[in-house]
């Protein structure tokens, strides 16, 4: 199984590469690519970690050698948020990066599962889909917006609030991956009850957690380490499912049946071909239903920006 990390010299990419070097199954191949000349050095550094995962690093203008034969491609390339920016401010730079990478993937490894981390995810996933579609290789079961960070934040914050072990908390998060489009389904957390006040406080905290980190880093970056952890969790789940493991479920932003929007995050059963089944997320509370209804216009507008960028 070959996993390619694209944008591997960045804050997320290096953290993700470190975690994958430690946690991929024995015999896996890990390829790192970034435009930055330091990338082969990052691979050399990680190659000294004694795990049975082979690693190679590539730099320069062309990601092709890293993409060749890849089963999973995780894209974290692009610029990060600075204080005062929201995820949509990143669009002007990151849209072009995702477009050119998707064009390379379409030629080099069109059957790979692609996890997009590069923000704004609501929009960049639509860009990748349109590029792959134009190339005649789009498989909606193999393109994912990685929203796992919203899930791990939800698990962490719920566990903190309720004095529980975060490993025992499961919070489905639906919608998109920015601001109001992030909807944690707190009504569905098993074994935990919330007051209306707790839900009203916790929901925006989860939605704005990225901004919390951007401000705390005071211009020195965005959420790179927690995002690396989230991307690793999603990447490992994909690898397990592609290897034939059953019952692997993660929330992700995918093209489904279009019930709410063309792309929508919800729990996904992963399988040997990517998305095996889009699971229904169950009954919503009144608070959640209202939040869902009021965010859909924002989500649809984000998607449209991506589609129109390619047309």
From Swiss-Prot:
Catalytic activity entry: (S)-malate + NAD(+) = oxaloacetate + NADH + H(+)
GO cellular component: a single term: cytoplasm
An individual GO BP term: malate metabolic process
Binding site for NAD(+): 7-13, 34, 94, 117-119, 227
Residues where substrate binds: 81, 87, 119, 153
Enzyme Commission number, as recorded: 1.1.1.37
InterPro entries: L-lactate/malate_DH (IPR001557), Lactate/malate_DH_C (IPR022383), Lactate/malate_DH_N (IPR001236), Lactate_DH/Glyco_Ohase_4_C (IPR015955), Malate_DH_AS (IPR001252), Malate_DH_type1 (IPR010097), Malate_DH_type1_bac (IPR023958), NAD(P)-bd_dom_sf (IPR036291)
Subunit: Homodimer.
Protein name (database record): Malate dehydrogenase
Species assigned in the record: Aliivibrio salmonicida (strain LFI1238)
Native organism taxonomy: Bacteria, Pseudomonadati, Pseudomonadota, Gammaproteobacteria, Vibrionales
